[in-house]
From Swiss-Prot:
It comes from Emericella nidulans (strain FGSC A4 / ATCC 38163 / CBS 112.46 / NRRL 194 / M139). Pfam families: MFS_1. Belongs to the major facilitator superfamily. Its main location: membrane. This is Major facilitator-type transporter hxnP. Induction: Expression is induced by nicotinate and 6-OH nicotinate, subject to nitrogen metabolite repression mediated by the GATA factor areA, and strictly regulated by the cluster-specific transcription regulator hnxR.
Amino acid sequence: MGATATDIEKVPSAGTPDEPKAGETNVYVDTEAEKSFVRKVDFFVLPMLCLMYFFDCMDRSNLANAKTDGLEEDINLKGNEYSLLILLFYIPFGLFDLPWNLLIKRYSARIMLSLRRYAVTVVWGICALCQCAANNFGGLLAIRIILGVFEAGFFAGSTFYFTLFYTRNEMGFRLAVLQSFAVLASAFSGLISFGLFQINHSAVKGWQWLFIVEGAMTLIIGVIGFWWLPDTAQSAWFLTQRERDAASARLLRDTSAEIETKLELKAAFQTWSDWKFPIWAVITFSYPVAYATAMNFFPIIVARLGYSVVKTNLWTVAPNLVGAVVLLVVAKSSDIFRERSLHIIFSLTVSLVGMLILASIDVSHNKGVSYFACFLLASGAYIPTCLVHAWHNNNNTNENSRAANTGFFVGLGNIAGVLSAATFRTEYAPKYVPTLVATCACNGVCILATAFMGTWMRLENRRKDKEQGARIVAGQVETRMLADGEKSPEWRYFL
């Protein structure tokens, strides 16, 4: 049994307090301690997770940079073997998200995220060295599959971990900050690649140095993370007791019906039979295709402009940096207005326009327009990753259910990377028009599904307002009062 509202100090009042009305609060939250708590979590927890995710993404996406330095020729890749290296990585990368997240709920994020990060560091370091000796498709494929197992679960686990500290209107921006480090990893991977590819060594190629150096850079951060991250706010070494009390109260006000609950599988899978679950599945499967296209194939797309290996890697930096800034701005707007669906649709539309331009013009004669389209793709492709998962978590007050749903939906999105990799076939080079068309189709499906879900939620909120004769929005009713979830009379969807 987790902590509930009865465990939290109530506001003093004369007589027996009535049940709180919409917009009122019975849970006392020390505002000064709350502000101090948020500042400390932003300072101690968020940066550590961002650094861990940065190196996580560096390891995952450097294959595209290595390709520009002659990886295919050096290990004799033939036909679609490069696409297979990416495609087969995404299978374990998607399948292991749910198990990792349930383990995080059972044993805490501090243990699972850090040990997983440390394990992948050791495994990747060993594999990087073995890769230098193997120099063949089979060896590299084995490395990618092992990497996929250990890389899985970090974003899903971090998303669930954030719900143990942040309220619903704080989630979007914090996830965007985390996601921006993935974008920065993609950008800096190009800069690091530029430097390492200049190393002239007869025995070790530039792309091999890339794997070795980026793998080694993750070791220290993985070890520190294990000792640095707290299990929950209640066990955080950097908080005072007053701040811990404020942390519990604020989560019961605007995140969870109960906190610090034990893992219960029945509760974890309780929403999987709901009719909306398949709609969420469509959304979380379709939006990541554009993200995977941008992350894994950006250097290849930019290479269509006809520049050298060095310039190709450098020219991927600017679109990613702009994409990171746009990501933070849109996510902050989403938190301020407590609105997700329209912001998601906006971002999907921006990346859709970019891909349509890339698919429809002759790149060799329209380099400026093509490069501008890369900026549009980067500006829109990264945003749904944080807002979609903030959205479905915002509409779920059960910790167990959030852990399972987030693991499944993030894993489903990771498997969607298979679609992106499968469509980047050598026979489609150099324009990759079928690839871009398929990605556009996925964006279109996601726009429709998101619009449907957002519209239905708005209509349902209005129906309840009409029945109860009062306009209530998500946030006015404390989540501690919503133990029955969507069946609670005062439930309102976070739009």
